[in-house]
Design a protein with these regions (language model features):
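Short amphipathic alpha-helices in soluble, non-transmembrane regions
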Residues: 438-446
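Conserved "right-hand" nucleotidyltransferase catalytic core of DNA-directed polymerases
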Residues: 1-218, 224-230, 237-240, 322, ...
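Hydrophobic (often cysteine-bearing) scaffold residues that line and stabilize catalytic clefts
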Residues: 28, 240, 269, 273, ...
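Conserved catalytic core of nucleic-acid polymerases
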Residues: 11, 62-66, 112, 126, ...
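Flexible helix-coil linker/hinge segments at domain or subdomain boundaries
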Residues: 448-461
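Short hydrophobic/aromatic beta-strand micro-patches
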Residues: 427-431
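Short acidic, glycine/serine/threonine-rich loops at helix termini
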Residues: 120, 243-246, 472-477
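Function-dense linear segments that define catalytic or interfacial modules
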Residues: 188-296
């Protein structure tokens, strides 16, 4: 016989432990359904499309969360060993400096307290303050504070060592992340993790694994395809930039197509970020080699001039101020000011778009992307922070919706195994003997075409790389990813025995 429990007249103390759980689960389902029914009646077609799209993504996300990625445990041990050796070298060098100059014999670089004592008491450097987790304005030794102090000649070698050791410590922490019993690392992707529609990721649903969306290039080679499979990493090219161009076109093409299309035309005509590099660094030896090769010259902490210039372009698109952008890009502030004058002179539609966003905030309080994703903004419309957030929102949401539309296409076709989404890229694996067929098909499947105003077609192009591990190929990583140019004649050098899988 079924026991009926009327929760409206329930004496909770009269229930057994099992009955308490039953009531809790029943309320959890019934109340949620009642709320859904009320909310569902209020959803318009714009919101419903976004809701249905998010629901459709649950299946590929669950599959990716469950599958995880195989780890080359031999490679992982080798990378850990190399990073530990680098750590010992930097620690020894740092202690030589501290003992010789400051007669300091014991120092733990990982201790914020000891770092504050060294920098602000022993070295007497200007105290850098910011609000801590408790909201108190207090001395800080975070990266931003240390990079400000590194401009002092006496502090530069000490701070460079501390920053280098912190980077190594963070990398070692990731490399030592426990694996599951099948030798795989997993994450938990969240479809609703951000306001833009981009995914976030964190530890897996059972508490292990980690965020796999911020893994640096130096660590990626430990991720390998399953035996008999090969990786493809497909990356949207200039996604946010082309989104900015599409918005400018839609807003202003009725007034002047040349004005409205100046930025989108530049995006579609070639390598935008190399063009930006030439604008900000005119004194590089342009003409002595291909422009992109010169732009890829290393500039700061493994970052190329092109990567730094890319930050300037994005920062300028998103209302970045010269002083802040100089810190982020490591270009002198005077160069950033000169760059922005040239940049906005070449693409005057961008500052006009910025003004349009402010008008929409003040008069409508919402923005809607060409993909149909709408967001309301509840901050003060005349506040700078709200304006900056709104300016960045639609281009970033367009990139997220474009890659996720492609991911859904790949999953529905059931020809590849999805692994890791990194905001504007997707890593998947496929039977390696099918490469010449799968890669061209996947490039087409990842397209999310739109038709802009005046019937202008718009699609964010995709670059493909293939290989047997997630790192870029090189002398020390022959099985890494290489740009796909119609075929890949390489043969895998590491077997499953060498991978440490058996």
């Amino acid at each position: 016989m079924v026991k009926i429990i009327n929760t409206a007249e329930l004496d909770q103390l009269s229930l057994s432990a099992d009955e308490n759980h039953w009531v809790y689960n029943g309320l959890d389902n019934c109340v949620t359904l009642e709320i859904y029914n009320e909310l569902n009646a209020t959803i318009d077609e714009t919101a419903r499309r976004t809701y249905e799209f998010s629901k459709a993504l649950q299946a590929p996300v669950l599959e990716m969360n469950m599958r995880g990625v195989l780890i080359n445990q031999n490679r992982r041990r080798a990378v850990i060993k190399a990073f530990e050796a680098k750590t010992r070298i930097l620690e020894a060098q740092l202690m030589t400096i501290l003992s010789g100059v400051f007669d300091l014999r014991d120092f733990n670089w990982a201790s914020p307290k000891q770092c504050k004592n060294l920098l602000y008491e022993v070295m007497q450097l200007p105290v850098q303050k910011k609000r801590n987790a408790r909201g108190i304005y207090a001395p800080s030794t975070d990266r931003e504070a240390l990079e400000k102090l590194s401009f002092y000649y006496i502090a530069e070698p000490v701070i460079n060592h501390i920053l280098g050791l912190r980077d190594l410590g963070k990398s070692l922490g990731f490399l030592r992340t426990p694996l599951d019993s099948d030798g795989r690392m997993r994450t938990s992707f969240s479809i609703a993790g951000t306001k833009t529609g981009r995914w976030s990721s964190s530890a897996s649903d059972i508490g292990d694994g980690t965020n796999l969306q911020n893994i640096t290039e130096s660590l990626r080679s430990i991720f390998v395809a399953d035996p008999g499979y090969k990786f493809a990493n497909m990356d949207l090219e200039q996604g946010d930039s082309r989104g900015v161009g599409a918005l400018c076109w839609n807003l202003f093409c009725d007034e002047d197509e040349a004005f409205a299309g100046s930025y989108l035309n530049a995006c579609e005509s070639g390598d935008l970020h190399t063009t930006v590099t030439k604008m900000v660094q005119p004194d590089l030896p342009w003409g002595t080699a291909p422009d992109k090769a010169i732009a890829e010259t290393i500039f700061y902490r493994g970052q190329s001039y092109r990567q730094a210039a890319k930050k300037l372009g994005h920062g300028s698109n998103y209302l970045g101020k010269p002083a802040h952008m100089a810190k982020q890009s490591k270009f002198p502030a005077a160069d950033v000011i000169r760059f922005q004058e040239q940049y906005f002179g070449a693409f005057p539609c961008i500052p006009k778009w910025h003004k349009n966003v402010r008008w929409r905030l003040e008069n409508l309080a919402f923005l809607e992307s060409p993909f149909g994703r709408r967001r309301f903004f509840f901050g003060r419309p005349n506040d700078g922070a709200t304006h900056r957030e709104a300016v960045a929102h639609v281009p970033q949401s367009m990139t997220g919706d474009a890659i996720n539309t492609g991911i859904l296409n790949l999953w529905r076709a059931n020809r590849v195994q999805l692994l890791i989404q990194v905001h504007d890229s997707i890593l998947f694996q496929f039977p390696q003997e099918q490469e010449d067929e799968i890669v061209p098909w996947a490039l087409e499947a990842l397209k999310a075409p739109l038709v802009l105003a005046h019937d202008r077609p718009f699609v964010i192009p995709t670059e493909a790389k293939t290989g047997w591990n997630w790192g870029n190929a090189g002398a020390d990583n022959p099985d890494g990813l290489v740009k796909w140019k119609g075929s890949d004649p390489r043969k895998q050098t590491e077997t499953k025995f060498r991978l440490g899988l058996l």
